[in-house]
C-alpha cells in the first residue's frame, strides 16, 4: 500500500481499455460512490491471481478488509465472481504485467446520438463508472495544489465550559505556522449548519469560534501550517483555561426549571418554537383532521414517549475541504458536500463576502447519506 500511494490504480498497468475486473465492476453496477472501488479491484486482482475460481465466501473474505458503506458488498462480490468466470472462459490468466485489448471496453454511446426510446427497459452504465474503476482523481482530496496549507482544529475536552483565557503566542511562533485563530480573532456571526433551502432552518446557534464550548469536541481554535505535523504541534502549544459549567446529558433534566442553559448567547435566532431558556431545540406539532374527535371516538389510545438517538451515517470519505483564491479574486471552496449552493449561500454572511465572490465546487463524494448536507468544516 505504501508503494501504491494515495491512488490505488497505480498498482496496475495502465492500458487503453479495461481489464476483466474493471469491466465487471462497471457493467454490474457495483460502483456507488466509488471511494473504495480501486482498492476492491486490487484485492480482487490479488485473489484471482492465486485462485481463478473462488467461491463466494472466498471473495467476501478477500474484500473484507476494505471498508464499504454504499454497497453492502453485494454487487462487488457479484462483480468479482463474474470477472473470474469471464477470465476462465476467455482462456486467459492474470499476470503481473497483463494488458488487455480495447475490445474489453464496454460499449458507451453519447446520449445525444440515441433515438428517444433507445434506453427504455435497458440497464445503463453509470456515467462516471469507468473513471472510478480506473481510480482516476475524482474526490476532493485528489486535488493537491502547490503551497497548500493544512488546517487543524483544537477541540474541547469539556462538554460545557467557558473559555476564560486562551494564549496562542507559542503556536504562532512555531516555524511553519501560517495562522492561528481563536474566538478573539474572528467576527461574531451567528449561523446554522443545516444545509437546507432558504429561509435557513434554524435555530441560528453556531459561530465559527466562540468563547463557550457546548460539547466534547467543540471547536476552540484553528491552525493553518505547512504540514499536518506542524499544525498538530501548534495545537499542543495553545494554552486554554476553561471554566467548567454544569453538564446535562438527559433531555428531561435539560428542560427543567433552573437547568443550565446551553445557548445563552443573545445572538440566538429562534426556529420551530425552540426555547433556549429550557434548552428546547424545536417543537413541532402536526395535526391531520379533527384530532380531538379522533381521540374521542377511538376504541384504544396508546401513549408513548419515543427516543430517537443520533445516528452517524459512516461514509468512508471524511469531510474534506480545499479553498483558494482564483485569478478573479473569488474564493473557491472545493468540498465534499451534498449541498454546494447552500454552502455558498450560508458562507457569504459568515465570511462577509458577496455571494458572487464565492464559488463552491462539489467533486464526487465518497458517500454522504445526508451527513454532508451539513456545513461543518467549510
Predicted features by range, described:
Residues 1-34, 230-256, 278-286, 293, ...:
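Gly/Pro-rich active-site capping loops and adjacent beta-alpha segments
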Residues 32, 67, 140-142, 169, ...:
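A generic local secondary-structure boundary/capping motif
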Residues 85-275, 301:
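Flexible, low-hydrophobicity surface segments
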Residues 261-351:
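Helix-loop-helix junctions that connect adjacent transmembrane helices in secondary transporters/permeases
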Residues 25-26, 125, 143-147, 205-207, ...:
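Solvent-exposed alpha-helices and their adjacent loops that cap or buttress functional pockets
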Residues 2-5, 25, 29, 48-52, ...:
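Structural signal for hydrophobic packing residues in well-ordered secondary-structure cores
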Residues 40, 49, 153-184, 221-241, ...:
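Alpha-helical support elements that line or immediately flank enzyme active sites
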Residues 1-106:
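Signature of N-terminal electron-transfer/Fe-S-associated modules in redox systems
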